[in-house]
Amino acid sequence: MCLFQGGHRFVKIFVAVIAVVAIEIGMLGGVEARSAKDAKPAHGGTILFVPQDDRPTSYEQSAAAAQKLGYTVLMPPKTMLGGLEAGEPDALWQWAEARVGEADAAVVSTDSLIYGGLVASRKHELSEEELAERVDRIARLKQLNPKMKVYAFGSLMRTPASGPASGGEEPDYYMTYGAQIFRRSGLLDKKDASGLSYGEQQELVSLTDAVPSEVWNDWMGRREKNFVANEQLIDFARKGTLDVFVLGKDDNAPLSATHMESRKLAEAAADVRPAHFQMLAGIDEFSMLLLARAVNDLSHTVPFVNVQYNWGVGGAMVPDYSDETIADSIKSDLLIAGAVAVPDAAKADLVLLVNTPPDGHMGCGNWADNDGTDRYDAASFAQFAQGFVDAGSRVAIADITRTNGSDNALMNALRDRALLFRLYGYAGWNTATNSVGFALGQGMLNVRLPDADVDRLLLDRYLDDWGYQSNVRTQVTEQLSWLKDTNTYLNLGRYEAATQLRVTRLLRQFAAQNLPPMPGVDHLDFYFPWHRMFIGGIVVPEK
């Protein structure tokens, strides 16, 4: 700590020296250490971007900040990408190989290129031979453009805790046997790591009988295929065929098949330098982090980031859907994005404030207690944020007291303090790791943008994370529950058009009540990308 108390100029020089040393030992990806505040957008740089699926967060929202900085982001048509069903990997490969020569960098989803998308990676029927051919094809991207850096990201197959928790994104049998599969895989993980008690051994026998062998063999067979593919991708990172490979533990748990596979892959990758391979909880945020990394490398920039937590458990919290502390996830996120953590907020290009629940137990955006009632922890965190903003820091907030939506009490406090559009980044969607990675990645790019562009990017998050996920979605889902159809949340079917109109109207009302007047908001449109309530798409006319 004392090393950073000697003054602004000394600290910048000292941290820059540390960053250069880190580059030399392989902690950062070969970029010059320079503050993001001094960086100039490299207009004309081109990034080839293959998203993991066609969701707005995966596609246009991940690319938006880089585009506003003046980079050309080449993206395939959405029709080639997967959603709930597999995309068109053959067409995607033709597109990528035709455009790769134009790119200075490539950020690519291995799940899209190998399986046809994130969800398809969990449900595919591809043979080992087909998978091997597609994995080898990824190596050829570098051969087609040797000067281009390739930043790749993929996933370990997730292990949802139950059928309902899977959201219908697993094979159909998971709805019936999901809870038993999850528990059985957790016991096998524990058996492999430390052994089972007598009671656990008996439970494992019972679960083995409870899950039909054809179901278990299908699920495990697919996992084994994907495991082999990930081993090969890690080897590409080892050899430099991939400049960076990030592997996500999607919807993970401390005892699960995902956790056991990650432990074995970590052992296999022990000799790969951290600058080239990272494995951590999450997946949906990786495109944002790696696009930020590509921009940082192309502009020869190493952003300095100070991380602060709400009072209480703070960085020691292990979020829902994760098997590691949020502090460890953020440490990895910084490395992935090519940033350096600094202990003094006054010396940072970006201050990342993480709104953790004081007791470490997350709620959910659609729970009844997320009613906006003032809470001490939310009010004090808003005051905490105001102190940094008023001191001149450029602040991004990762709102992770809840999964799948913003903390209404915090958002009301930020609104009442007129802080919403004094920030440089915000995220409060899906899992904690998704929100942290997105707020960090977009925040470190937003600090280089004009205020009007930052406001437009913040608007997307406030309308989606706060407006839709924590308020309108909850209200409309309750109304849909009055219908006789019980599965409308996961499949809107004949109710989609009417529901879309209802959500659009309520979102416009929400914006009018909670956000300052902004161009186009009163004419925003809403749609359901996957024809289900969980995921929304919001379009605000530019003019």
Annotate the PLM regions.
Residues 1-3, 21, 218:
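Charged, low-complexity surface segments at secondary-structure and domain boundaries
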